[in-house]
């Protein structure tokens, strides 16, 4: 799309980069797990990943070139191989299927998603009917619903609340997908609490820190610029939320790479905002900057709302290997 003819090297634009942006701790951990597994099992075992390790085309294609095989079903993995669960988590039934096979399983589920899984299990064990606020069909939602055998009610919007059939309003609890819009989720929670005053739940604590930070920064960024580009894949929930939030204030486009930028959109633009979803590597942001510099004068600046320092450890076996062979 970018091959539209537009180049004005005299035109100066300010490009404001959102901070934080891109990889969250859960995504960084999942990708590190796969890369360490490639080294650890080199020439000894085939490595399969169940579903996309994270929802980003660039990352998936890069890992494929390193020998990783992405599959949709456990039975596609050969006996004696390694199977890695994606950052979005999997259902208990999938884990049970894997246990029946001769597979070495590594769980790359984000610890914050695992936290929601434990909440669902605890509520169910205590006799509560569970509502999950999230998007039907999303891998994370499928994994969370699959933590218990009791049916989980999925609420995607306010209208869904009116259709809920409850057994006992005093034994009702909710959890949320970790990558939702904070603002939209708060409205849904408020309506649930109004309709079911005794409902239990974590408020907005299930929505991960990185999702909240990126949304807060993106909202502010959109107020300052004429257009926002969000680096992220179309199937990335958190990236789509960033596009929606930025779009409230200004033009917003979710792109996989600089190749999707239509330069004609920038004719009358003086300020461009750039951010990235939690699964998007920063190399994609740098490529956008380099591309813009080929067509106009670029003045770079940062918008930093909050600093992040969260990290998650990889599984012990890989951590020991890393410490032994990849000393920092």
From Swiss-Prot:
Pfam families: LYTB. Pathway: Isoprenoid biosynthesis; dimethylallyl diphosphate biosynthesis; dimethylallyl diphosphate from (2E)-4-hydroxy-3-methylbutenyl diphosphate: step 1/1; Isoprenoid biosynthesis; isopentenyl diphosphate biosynthesis via DXP pathway; isopentenyl diphosphate from 1-deoxy-D-xylulose 5-phosphate: step 6/6. [4Fe-4S] cluster binds at residues 24, 110, 208. Its EC number is 1.17.7.4. Its cofactor is [4Fe-4S] cluster. The keyword Oxidoreductase applies. Gene3D superfamilies: 3.40.50.11270, 4-hydroxy-3-methylbut-2-enyl diphosphate reductase, catalytic domain. (2E)-4-hydroxy-3-methylbut-2-enyl diphosphate binds at residues 55, 88, 138, 178, 236-238, 279. Dimethylallyl diphosphate binds at residues 55, 88, 138, 236-238, 279. Catalyzes the conversion of 1-hydroxy-2-methyl-2-(E)-butenyl 4-diphosphate (HMBPP) into a mixture of isopentenyl diphosphate (IPP) and dimethylallyl diphosphate (DMAPP). Acts in the terminal step of the DOXP/MEP pathway for isoprenoid precursor biosynthesis. This is 4-hydroxy-3-methylbut-2-enyl diphosphate reductase. It comes from Ehrlichia ruminantium (strain Welgevonden).
